[in-house]
């Protein structure tokens, strides 16, 4: 096995692209297109196999579009796990981009087949299933990489390391929101994605909180380096009448006691994909907006504001520069964040297969522990809402007060 040892995000470590399979992502899906584009743009993966739809006709038609050979287009993910594990040229990782309720059993099958897993969020629909995957990952010693793409924007990485390096001082408060409009009006009868997102048998205890709240929670954790220790939550339906919440208001305390607010809604007309975060400390504040991903606003206490723009040099930290591929003025956006995620996943999978220990922080990926934390967050929000908005402790520790 050739191992180059390079960690360039556009240079595969094994001197070749890794073989990747997909579960889900075929025609009619949305998230699968982003995964597909990110994997291709990363230059680390060849997509060689897939069970792209639960509808066999759609699965094979989608495979033809993706240039997957007919004998490696599967109608059943379980058959794919068995067949690919038995091949000398079988897939080296699988990307699971199916709806929430299928994640646990599909990931289980591929981990047991000895195949590394790239898994869409949320990890599962229950905390117990998430814990099972954590234990299985440890038992099989295979990777489970959770796909939180926003953390792979260059300017999110910039913000993360600026905060780690003391740019805002001690974190004193944080506000994060993810606001959309698509669930405002009544759903049409053929809106399959919208319908299953309102079915507790398929999504678990929360709808919008699991769908986009987990992204907001993960971004908060990524930037501050802290988990939410306790929270109180209220679920609301602010759009057309539906079975589960389309809006959640969450008040929280971080591990150091700093207060904050997390707000998610899918029923705010005029809001498209408004993932925004603001973190303030005793020395300054940072702001980032997913709809303007190339800019990061930083205001040191008592000084003029600074706008960091994605590009090389001019204050961009090395950890963020690794995620930058074009000069300033040549736009990079969400598909580039997906490509960065798949590139870092490629580095991690290649290193594991070669038995090579990557240098600390050479990749910054989310694993099974992050997936479990996302499920604990959803459960805590649901527990709080169901108890009338009471405070719920996630880690059981006492919380100091700043405000």
Swiss-Prot record:
Domain of life, per lineage: Bacteria
Record-level Gene Ontology MF annotations: nucleotide binding; oxidoreductase activity
Enzyme Commission (EC) number: 1.-.-.-
Name of a matching Pfam family: GFO_IDH_MocA
Segment forming the signal sequence: 1-63
Sorted UniProt keywords: Oxidoreductase, Plasmid, Signal
SUPFAM superfamilies xrefs: Glyceraldehyde-3-phosphate dehydrogenase-like, C-terminal domain (SSF55347), NAD(P)-binding Rossmann-fold domains (SSF51735)
Enzyme class: oxidoreductase
Coiled-coil residues: none
Family annotation (Gene3D superfamilies): Dihydrodipicolinate Reductase, domain 2, NAD(P)-binding Rossmann-like Domain
InterPro entries xrefs: Gfo/Idh/MocA-like_OxRdtase_N, Gfo/Idh/MocA_oxidoreduct, GFO_IDH_MocA-like_dom, NAD(P)-bd_dom_sf
Similarity comment: family membership: Belongs to the Gfo/Idh/MocA family.
Stated name of the protein: Uncharacterized oxidoreductase y4hM
Protein species of origin: Sinorhizobium fredii (strain NBRC 101917 / NGR234)
């Amino acid at each position: 096995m050739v191992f180059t040892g390079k960690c360039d995000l556009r240079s595969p470590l094994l001197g070749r692209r890794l073989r990747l399979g997909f579960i889900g992502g075929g025609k009619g899906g949305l998230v699968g297109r982003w995964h597909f584009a990110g994997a291709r743009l990363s230059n680390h993966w060849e997509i060689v196999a897939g069970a792209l739809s639960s509808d066999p006709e759609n699965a094979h038609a989608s495979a033809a579009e993706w240039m997957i050979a007919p004998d490696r287009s599967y109608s059943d993910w379980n058959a794919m796990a068995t067949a690919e594990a038995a091949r000398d040229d079988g897939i080296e990782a699988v990307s699971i981009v199916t709806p929430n309720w299928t994640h646990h059993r599909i990931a289980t099958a591929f981990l047991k087949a000895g195949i590394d897993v790239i898994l869409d969020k949320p990890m599962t629909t229950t905390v117990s299933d998430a814990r099972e995957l954590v234990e299985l990952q440890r038992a099989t010693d295979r990777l489970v990489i959770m796909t939180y793409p926003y953390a792979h924007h260059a300017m999110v990485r910039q913000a993360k390391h600026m905060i780690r390096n003391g740019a805002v001082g001690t974190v004193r408060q944080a506000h994060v929101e993810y606001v959309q409009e698509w669930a405002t009006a009544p759903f049409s009868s053929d809106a399959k994605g919208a319908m299953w997102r309102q079915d507790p048998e398929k999504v678990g205890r929360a709808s919008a909180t699991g769908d986009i709240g987990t992204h907001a929670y993960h971004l908060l954790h990524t930037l501050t380096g802290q988990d939410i220790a306790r929270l109180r939550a209220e679920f609301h339906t602010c759009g057309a009448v539906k079975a589960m919440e389309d809006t959640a208001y969450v008040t929280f305390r971080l591990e150091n006691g700093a207060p904050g607010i997390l707000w998610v809604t899918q029923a705010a007309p005029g809001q498209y994909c408004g993932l925004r975060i603001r973190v303030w400390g005793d020395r300054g504040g940072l702001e980032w907006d997913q709809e303007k991903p190339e800019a990061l606003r930083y205001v040191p206490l008592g000084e003029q504001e600074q706008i960091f723009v994605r590009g090389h040099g001019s204050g961009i930290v090395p950890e963020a520069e690794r995620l930058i591929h074009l000069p300033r003025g040549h736009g990079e956006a969400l598909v580039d964040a997906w490509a960065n995620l798949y590139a870092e996943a490629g580095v991690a999978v290649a290193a594991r297969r070669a038995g090579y220990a990557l240098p600390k922080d050479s990749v910054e990926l989310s694993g099974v522990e992050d997936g479990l934390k996302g499920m604990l967050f959803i459960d805590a929000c649901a527990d709080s809402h169901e108890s009338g908005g009471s405070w719920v402790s996630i880690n059981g520790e006492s919380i100091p007060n700043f405000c």
